[in-house]
């Protein structure tokens, strides 16, 4: 089940798994979320793109990466005009549609380190995680990838059902 509920202090907390890399459909649209798979978002002078591991859109290849699971890549192709692995760093958002911010008191991102074999010694570090709501009311899970490499994660929202 996508939902797990448990009672606590007369409140019902709902855990919804928004995204799991074990899903083979790219970005788990069946779980009611959407992710930019090409084009990404613009932050300053850099464009952060979310692409499936097997997706070669915008020249992002899957070579040198582990297989068997989806991956979110954070690319900054405008850094030097290419999709260089060396420039894969920055902040990003995974957008979650149709979620009322008031219904979710907090969230949790579970992730594991995954060495990007195209960048020697480069591991993922997540900081600055938090919920983000844009001007149109779209709620996103914000993460920051300090060191580049490939991000693997299971994203959950824990919320107070009201």
Provide a role label for each language-model segment.
Residues 1-162:
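Surface-exposed molecular-recognition determinants
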